[in-house]
């Protein structure tokens, strides 16, 4: 890896253009695999705008042909979705989300980057387990927010959203209840159904027994996935261990939050334990146990 040069990789033309579905289902190939990872590590420049990021991504070889593979692309893929929102709406993506999602749902404590003294006072610390104790790593190299603040010139859709359990619970319930919460219609029912349905035309499993919906990972085969969730459960996790999931079969939505840098996002052992406990109590298959 030390001698690997991503600039000398042999490339071939893409078979087709990348679609919105590709971006949402992590099947675009953008900034994915060894080449994408090495290019990301090489990039030390402060981020200035989504437009500038798009130009940068355009010069990075895809990890695979669009729609023919799967690879987690939370930075490039979701930044491009943010740029698309700005182009279509004519608004900054942060303002658009506040107007169309946060305010209608009453998510008053959800925002991209704290910009007031009161907000900064309420931000929780970031921790990492070192040996047998948790160490405060806020603001250090292990704190991804410090890295994301390279992007102060614009709202990075790949990260930087702050929220609370109460606020995010409203968002989760909106999805569980078919796109509507507390009288506010955010999404059509068919849109929510699409989010929770396998999206790529090719059957692509990012993990055994799991497939991508639109922005969501779906437990298609819980036994194969070694999961306690019921079939069709969907959701996603944050880099610091936040986790939410929705089980349409059980009429269940759950939100869990923590703030540690060593939990491996969606692979967190804590997230799996939370799922085991929740489905053990409320899951359809366990109601008669």
PLM ranges: what are they?
Residues 1-231:
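Short, surface-exposed loop or secondary-structure junction motifs
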Residues 63, 260-263:
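A short, flexible beta-alpha/helix-coil linker loop
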Residues 130, 248-249:
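Short, ordered coil/turn segments that flank beta-strands lining enzyme active or ligand-binding pockets
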Residues 169, 242, 277:
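C-terminal helical cap and adjacent loop that interface with cofactors, partners, or active-site loops
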Residues 177-181, 191, 196-202, 221, ...:
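Short, gly/Ser/Thr-rich active-site loops of penicillin-recognizing serine hydrolases
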Residues 238-240:
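Short, small/polar residue-rich loop motifs at catalytic or cofactor-binding pockets
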Residues 244-245, 251-260:
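Short, well-ordered beta-strand elements
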